Amino acid sequence: MRYLTHRILLLALLAAPMCLASQSDAGRNRLIRQVRHELVMLPYYGVFDNLAYKVDGYKVTLLGQVTRPTLKSAAENVVKDIEGVESVDNQIVVLPLSPNDDRLRMALYRAIYSRPGLDRYALMAVPPIHIIVANGNVSLEGYVASEMDKNLANVTANGVSGVFSVTNNLVVEK
């Protein structure tokens, strides 16, 4: 009887870290989903902004580029209010004001989202192809359904007059 009790106790002690690990994984996954939800729901988050984040324990690091300084501070404030977040490291870059960059943004938006094959992405609430323009240099961020869409967006962006370079960071969903 004593041997059986010791064995049950030993099994319980061995199983406890696995239960705690699954609970912490569930908590981490909940935190990741909540951070994503709060960032996507920001009122002025649009196709010309790119927000990303990293969760390390209870610390959230915000990354990306935005066109408005208020969006940078709003992102930090909504993430700070999430239950379980202890600190926020805001590394979001505010893009410089430039009439030429604004003109390029509109021309790129029109070219990419009116292109047959890519026009279906324009119908989504938050279009998945984000167009980041900094001093004439373009970065395409986000997700597309196929490698062909990724290449088509790259060729289209390169064809817009006034673009100095295009960095294609689009990820193909699998």
Model-derived segments and spans:
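N-terminal targeting leaders
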Residues: 2-7, 19-174
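Hydrophobic core
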Residues: 13-19
